[in-house]
Each structure stands twice: as C-alpha cells, then as structure tokens.
Amino acid sequence: FSGIAQVIAAGTVLSDVYLYLGIGLLLTGFAFKVALAPFHMWSPDVYQGAPTTITGFLCTAPKAAGFGAVLKVFMIAFPETFTQWQDLFWVLAALTMTVGNISALVQSNVKRMLAFSSVSHAGYIVIGILVQDMAGISAVLFYLVVYSIMNLGAFAILSMAENDEQDLTFRQFRGLASRNPLLSAAMAIFMVSLAGFPPTAGFIAKYGLFSAAIAKGYIWLVVIAVLNTLVSFYYY
C-alpha cells in the first residue's frame, strides 16, 4: 500500500482515469461490504433470514474487518487523492446515517430494525475515516469495539428470548421485564448504549468521533449526525 502511495505522490501514474476508476470500484466494493447507503439493501433481508446467532456475527466481524480495510487502503495507499474522495465520503456518511435511522423507525421486526441500525452506525464510522489523522483512527477503532460488543450482546439476548426465528417482532418481547428481569435490564443497557445516551460507552464512542470531526471542520456533518442520533432514540 505504501508503494501505491509513493507512485501517486511521484506523479508516475500511467493514467489518472484508471486511478480514479480503480478507487471508485474499491469504494463501491467496500460500501457494499460494510452496508453503506445505497449499497445496504442486502443487509435487512440477510439479518432477518439468518439464525439470530449468525446475524450477531454478520453485523459485527465483517463490518469491523471491512472498515479496517477501508482505513488501510484510503489512509495508506490513497492519501494523496484525499481531496478527490473526501466529498464522496461526506455524502456517503450523511446518506447512510439518515437512510439507516429513518428506515429503522418503521420496522416491526427486531432483527430488521437492528439491521438498519447497523447501517446508520456505518455512517457514523465514515465520519472518523474522513478525519484522516490519528484522532480519527483511534475514534473509529474504539467505536468499532463498542459497537461490536453492544450488538453481540443484543443478539445474544434475542437468541435467548425469541420464540419464533421467522417472525421476531417487538410484540414477542412484551412483558420480558416480568418474565426475565435480568435479560430485560441487559437489553435495555445495550440499546441505550447503541443510542449513545451518556454515560454509556456508546456515548463516549460517538463523542470521540464527533470531536475529531469538529476539529477538522466537519461541523455540518456532525450536526447531521447529532440529529440522526436524536432520531435513533425513538426506535431504540
């Protein structure tokens, strides 16, 4: 990757057209992998159709690996082309956050709701990638750890509390607090953290991302992210 960066910096690329075409294809592939809008439509169906334990894995490990690859490729191989792709990342972040949260609002299936929630979190993570410094990298890595723990916990509880794999609706979880107070309390903690309520780890993770972005001048993107976070409070 550093060799690619050296070639680009030296201006010895054979064709800028091929360079930007390659970057575009890479970005499209990564966007599909980590479920960025508008490449996210596979995730709700897959999350709903897969066994709950498998869904917990799908929404964490592949996403963390995908964003790790994005960080390495775009921060090590293509730092010289940052001005060309930063606006596209800005749009992807805003679109992904908004589409994910609005779509999650209207879901009746718990796993589909968490799928669109996962989409919105991908949008938040892109903000950290835009920062392009150590503060952004640290914020992204911490966010991925917190996000993974919260989602693994939430899906573990779903797998223990569910009655029907094919129709895991909110109605099935009515009265969970009286039937199993411990599971109910744990689920509430995970949801509150995913929403970003203080003083949870989710709040600390979002605060780190937003602070790093503000320091780099992405104020309007942070405003959009905060508004989306407020929207997410409703469905969580």
Descriptions of predicted regions:
Residues 1-236:
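Alpha-helical transmembrane segments of multi-pass membrane proteins predominantly involved
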